[in-house]
Regions:
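Alpha/beta catalytic cores of group-transfer enzymes, especially the acyltransferase/condensing modules
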Residues: 16, 34-184
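Acyltransferase/transacylase module recognition
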Residues: 1-18, 149-242
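FabD-like malonyl-/acyl-CoA
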Residues: 1-78, 126, 203-233
Length: 242
């Protein structure tokens, strides 16, 4: 959000004319702030609460996440469904073509990874301390439901795309419920990007540290234009298509 403000106020580049705003997981809050839904102060406050709530939902070291590379969502869903009596795992992120993240308790993830190995599906444990975006985050959902209800949400100045549904959000009345649901829900990033492309978007601008989302978007559709803004030099190079 800070970089967004710098681009807009100091460099006079009007990113507010973007057709859509979207963010991945925690980044969805930055998208809301950039679209004028939340104030910067409220965004910082609720993210601090969110972080503590999610970390406290599962004892440290008891849960985790596994990234799966080179497989498709249908295959992973099938593996989880076929083994539901042996372990319980959840698709947490549908990031792009060939990149899926699964959450669960450590013991269940180990069993799941054995199945992946048997099918020669590449996977790697992520260095995280909790199983985000699954029903194991229920305690965090309860906390966030109460805290989000206290916030004032303005009507979005731009169309937002929800992590939970992968679809457009047209008014603030839906936003609070979707943000609460986001805690336990799959991040439908691939679906979100495809929606925007199908609505005519041909250029994406990633604002924030790193270029992870840029890479994901390119894997979803190599024909779209993708730019990442991480610092002042990137801002000077930005070229927004009319």
């Amino acid at each position: 959000y800070s970089i967004f403000k710098l681009v807009k106020d100091e460099f006079n580049i009007n990113l507010s004319k973007a057709n859509f705003f979207a963010g991945h997981s925690l980044g969805e809050y930055s998208a809301l702030a950039s679209a004028g839904v939340l104030t910067f102060a409220d965004t910082l406050k609720i993210l601090k609460i969110r972080g503590k709530a999610m970390q406290s939902s599962v004892p440290k070291g008891k849960g985790g996440m596994v990234a799966i590379l080179g497989s498709d969502i249908e295959t992973i869903e099938k593996i989880i469904k076929e083994n539901k009596n042996k372990y319980e795992c959840f698709i947490a992120n549908d990031n792009s073509v060939g990149q899926i993240v699964v959450s669960g308790n450590i013991d269940d993830l180990e069993k799941f990874m054995v199945n992946l190995k048997l099918k020669n599906i590449k996977n790697v444990k992520l260095p995280v301390s909790a199983p985000f975006h699954c029903k194991l985050m229920n305690k965090a959902t309860i906390i966030m439901n109460e805290e989000i209800s206290k916030l004032n949400f303005e009507e979005p100045k731009n169309t937002l795309v929800s992590n939970v549904t992968g679809k457009e959000i047209f008014d603030s009345s839906d936003l609070k419920n979707l943000l609460v649901k986001q805690i336990e829900s799959r991040v439908r990033w691939r679906e979100s990007v495809l929606l925007m492309i199908n609505k005519g978007v041909s250029q994406f601008i990633e604002i924030g540290p790193g270029k992870i989302l840029s890479g994901l978007i390119k894997r979803i559709d190599k024909n779209v234009k993708v730019s990442a803004i991480n610092n002042e030099e990137d801002i000077k190079l930005i070229n927004i298509d009319e």
